[in-house]
Amino acid sequence: MKIFPAIDLRDGRAVRLTQGDYDKMTVYSAQPCGVARRFIRTGARNLHVVDLDGAKDGTPSMANLVEIEALVQQGHAFIEVGGGIRTEERIRQYLDLGVGRCILGTVAVENFAFVERMAQRYQEKIAVGVDARDGMVATHGWQKTSGEESFSFCRRLRDAGVRTVIYTDISRDGTLGGTNLEAYRKLTELEGLEIIASGGISSVKEIEALKDMGAGGAILGKAVYDGKLDLGMSLRAAGDMRDELDDKLPLF
């Protein structure tokens, strides 16, 4: 199972939100690349990067775009990016930069046919983020709730050719209170769809449980930033530790 340490960007800084609330934001670093290098030196192979400004407003932030480009250029990790990606032009821009996978969110609810076309055209380079609040899909950086039931929406995505869904239980995100294992147990029963778990993962036992049930990956955020969850132990539990650590990779 893959482990994705998360780097959420706002105004070019690495931050974390609590339950998707932009008024409950903690700034962890003004140097996102430094954060990424620490994760990579610990053994991470993958990074999950979100443009929070783009997710909220629908317009990708230039400051965040600069940081994403820098993250890609320093190499050493597969990078998936989400937040405000609502056009094919933006998808192409990120893929041309060297981003490994683009995550579509709000547009999947508002323009399902577009997501179906993009999934067929770009295949494994497209994932969809399904963010659930009380079982319903939330959009616009979690600021609005749609009329789509989250599990049935995941089935629709699979049937449309989407290969990977990143499923977040918003009520657990950033709370350090544990993730919704029961939801992931149901989701992993959907054949032909890779499920990446996100939101509230705060223990190695949860990572082991997700791996055992067949989840394709887990996104780690606040628990790692706050020191509650050891990234190295998490990588080893998932079987996703980098073979060789690059001790020469600068931290800053």
Predicted features by range, described:
Residues K2-A6, N46, H76-E80, G100-I103, ...:
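Structural preference for beta-strand elements that scaffold enzyme active sites
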Residues N46-N64, T106, Y167-G177:
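Glycine-rich, proline-tolerant flexible connector loops at the mouths of alpha/beta enzymes
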Residues G58-E80, E116-D131, L176-S203, D243-E244:
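Alpha-helix-loop-beta-strand connector modules within alpha/beta enzyme cores
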Residues F114-R121, K211-L220, V224-F252:
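C-terminal helical cap(s) of enzyme catalytic domains, especially alpha/beta-barrels
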